[in-house]
A protein has these predicted regions:
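Ligand-binding "clamshell"
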Residues: 102-109, 197-207
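Hydrophobic hinge/microswitch elements
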Residues: 162-205, 212, 243
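C-terminal effector-binding regulatory domain of bacterial HTH transcription factors
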Residues: 68, 72, 191-200, 210-256
Length: 256
C-alpha cells in the first residue's frame, strides 16, 4: 500500500515514501521538458486581430521588417470589422480603435488620431477653387461611416456655407481614401491610414487645418499574457515603429 487514510486525509506509507523518492526526479524532468515545450511554442505562432484598413495601410507594408528581426515568430493576420471583442481565445494581440479603456486588457497607444482634409492632385488643379476652407462648398465631401466628422470639422472652422449633409458614405476608411485619390471629392483622412497615399503622391492636404479626435489606435492583449515572449516582442516592435515614424513626420514638417 502506498497510502493510509487518516480522518479525511491520505498519508504516504513507508512504501509510498520510498516510491515517491524514486519517481521524484522523473516528475522534475517531465516538468522541465514541459516548460521547454511551452517556451518553444510561445515563440511560434502569433495571431493578430485588427481592422482591415489598419492591416492594409499600416501593418502589412511593415511586416517584412518584423519578420526579418524575429524569424522564429510566425505572424497570422486576422482582419475583422469590429474592434472590441475581437481579442478572442485564439488571438494573441489585437489593434483596437477607441479611447484606451478596456477592462482586463493591457492597452498601449500607437497613434493619436487626427483627421486631415485630403484630395487628389488633379482635383486641386481643376476648375473649382480650393484656396481656402470655404471653397469646400464647391466640392463633394466624402464621408467615412457617417457625416459626423465633416459636421464637426465645419463647426470648429465656422464653415456655415459648406453643406455637410450630402456626399457618399463609405463603410471603410480605405474606400474613402481611394475615392478621394480617384478625384471623386474631398475626404477627412485618418493621419495613420492616409499616410501611404500621401507619401505616394496620390493624395495631398490642401489646408493646414485638422480635426483632433478623442480616439487613438492601441495595441492590446490580455493583462495576464502581457509579458509572454512573442506578445511582448511584437508589442514592443509596434510601439518602437510607431514612435520612430511619428518623429520622422515631425522632423519632415519642421524642415518644410
Amino acid at each position: 500500500k502506498l497510502f493510509r487514510r487518516r480522518n479525511r486525509s491520505l498519508l504516504l506509507t513507508e512504501e509510498g515514501q520510498s516510491y515517491f523518492l524514486d519517481i521524484k526526479d522523473i516528475f522534475s524532468s517531465l516538468a522541465e521538458a514541459t516548460d521547454k515545450l511551452l517556451e518553444r511554442s510561445e515563440k511560434g505562432a502569433l495571431t493578430i486581430s485588427l481592422p482591415p484598413s489598419f492591416a492594409i495601410q499600416w501593418l502589412v507594408p511593415r511586416l517584412a521588417d518584423f519578420n526579418q528581426q524575429e524569424p522564429d515568430i510566425d505572424v497570422r493576420i486576422k482582419a475583422v470589422d469590429m474592434d472590441e471583442g475581437s481579442l478572442t481565445d485564439d488571438v494573441d494581440v489585437a489593434i483596437y480603435y477607441g479611447r484606451g479603456s478596456w477592462p482586463g486588457l493591457r492597452a498601449d497607444k500607437l497613434y493619436q488620431e487626427f483627421l486631415i482634409p485630403l484630395c487628389s492632385p488633379a482635383l486641386l488643379l481643376g476648375n473649382k477653387p480650393m484656396e481656402k476652407l470655404s471653397d469646400l462648398a464647391y466640392h463633394t465631401l466624402l464621408h467615412d461611416t457617417s457625416r459626423k466628422d465633416w459636421k464637426q470639422f465645419a463647426k470648429e472652422n465656422g464653415l456655415d456655407n459648406v453643406n455637410v449633409n450630402h456626399g457618399p458614405i463609405f463603410s471603410h476608411s480605405t474606400m474613402v481614401l481611394q475615392a478621394a485619390a480617384h478625384g471623386q471629392g474631398v475626404a477627412l483622412g485618418n493621419n495613420v491610414l492616409a499616410q501611404p497615399e500621401i507619401d505616394a503622391g496620390r493624395l495631398i492636404a490642401p489646408f493646414d487645418e485638422v480635426l483632433m479626435t478623442n480616439n487613438a489606435f492601441y495595441v492590446v492583449c490580455h493583462e495576464k499574457q502581457a509579458d509572454m515572449g512573442r506578445i511582448a516582442t511584437f508589442r514592443d516592435w509596434m510601439l518602437k515603429k510607431a514612435r520612430s515614424e511619428q518623429v520622422d513626420i515631425l522632423q519632415h514638417k519642421h524642415n518644410q
